[in-house]
Regions:
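Short-chain dehydrogenase/reductase
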Residues: 97, 146-154, 190, 194-198, ...
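Short, flexible, glycine-rich and Lys/Arg-enriched loop motifs at helix boundaries
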Residues: 38, 168, 178-199, 210-231
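Short, electropositive, low-hydrophobicity segments enriched in small/polar residues
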Residues: 11-17, 40, 61, 86, ...
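Pocket-edge positions in alpha/beta enzyme catalytic cores
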Residues: 57, 69, 96, 144, ...
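C-terminal substrate-binding subdomain of Rossmann-fold SDR/epimerase-dehydratase oxidoreductases
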Residues: 200-338
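Generic alpha-helical secondary structure signal
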Residues: 39-42, 50, 63, 198, ...
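N-terminal Rossmann-like NAD(P)+-binding domain of SDR-like oxidoreductases, especially those catalyzing
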Residues: 1-183
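A short, structure-level motif marking secondary-structure boundaries and short turns
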Residues: 1-2, 91-93, 144-145, 189-190, ...
Length: 338
């Protein structure tokens, strides 16, 4: 298939592009490089074994989107492009709604103009809000996300659901990720956050490699086994494979298809720290800090629907997530070159 991957040079997007190329698909990447670097493109080509076409541009540029979709006879769009820092979204809500909601609207309008009807959306477990039961199941009603980031993901899910109701020949997949971590096993591709990392694993990696002094663990008094927050961590390669499978199985299959992509088990912050210490062969400096407002004690996915319907399940362990992250970070302590 010919696939347009928005945000394809970002963390999850780049790993997914490699897996798409390895599976024989033609990949067209669109990215504005606001949170990624052009130097990842030759890495995608080398690891994928095939050349991806690249456009530097913004999903809010509807004319450009329409032109790309039409000129490249795109079959499917996988939509990663968007802003994703929960904390920053509280400070900059309008930027998040403009990028994530308005940007998706412009992209969908371009797809309608180009008659492209297969869409895979990079959603998030944040759409569940605070649920009374764990694990989270797709049939749960969506909650009230705490942050503008989470709200923007939920708004887009609602927009896409309404669109599919009005245009029943569309196939829309809403893939709800839990906590993507890890890196390509080659050690040449991984998460390269701009500025201070917002996510746990890249922060730990930067502490281990000497770029940061110590990891702040927010809260050690949660009602969990060791007092730290529990989350569902999924290896980015398993997540990338999930996109390929969803794209191949759901293409031209009308409907709204919702799947949790998670490991289906919870690990605490200290579990992750300990796995990383084992991977890098030295203790990782950390200190406890007060809880962050809005953080939940524990949640993880029920991913059995993806197993049942897509024949997808995770194959990589927390130890492998830590090992692959350390392999990437130790080989590339400053991330990708500018």
């Amino acid at each position: 298939m010919r696939v347009l991957v928005t945000g394809g040079s970002g963390y999850i997007g780049s790993h997914t592009c490699v897996q798409l190329l390895q599976n024989g698909h033609d990949v067209i990447i669109l990215d504005n490089l606001c949170n990624s670097k052009r130097s990842v493109l030759p890495v995608i080509e080398r690891l994928g074994g095939k050349h991806p076409t690249f456009f530097e541009g913004d999903i809010r540029n509807e004319a450009l989107m329409t032109e790309i979709l039409h000129d490249h006879a795109i079959d499917t769009v996988i939509h990663f492009a968007g802003l994703k820092a929960v904390g920053e979204s509280v400070q900059k809500p309008l930027e998040y709604y403009d990028n994530n909601v308005n940007g998706t609207l412009r992209l969908i309008s371009a797809m309608r103009a180009a008659n492209v009807k297969n869409f895979i959306f990079s959603s998030s477990a944040t759409v569940y809000g605070d649920q009374p039961k764990i694990p989270y199941v797709e049939s749960f009603p969506t909650g009230t996300p705490q942050s503008p980031y989470g709200k923007s993901k939920l708004m887009v899910e609602q927009i896409l659901t309404d669109l599919q109701k009005a245009q029943p020949d569309w196939s829309i997949a809403l893939l709800r990720y839990f906590n993507p971590v890890g890196a390509h096993p080659s050690g040449d591709m991984g998460e390269d956050p701009q500025g201070i990392p917002n996510n746990l694993m890249p922060y730990i990696a930067q502490v281990a490699v000497g770029r940061r002094d110590s990891l702040a663990i927010f809260g050690n008094d949660y009602p969990t086994e060791d007092g730290t927050g529990v989350r569902d961590y999924i290896h980015v390669m398993d997540l990338a494979d999930g996109h390929v499978v969803a794209m191949e199985k759901l293409a031209n299959k009308p409907g709204v298809h919702i799947y949790n992509l998670g490991a289906g088990v919870g690990n605490s912050v200290l579990d992750v720290v300990n796995a990383f210490s084992k991977a890098c062969g030295k203790p990782v400096n950390y200190h406890f800090a007060p809880r962050r407002e809005g953080d939940l004690p524990a949640y993880w996915a029920d991913a059995s629907k993806a197993d049942r319907e897509l024949n997808w399940r995770v194959t990589r362990t927390l130890d492998e997530m830590a090992q692959d992250t350390w392999h990437w970070q130790s080989r590339h302590p400053q991330g990708y070159p500018d």
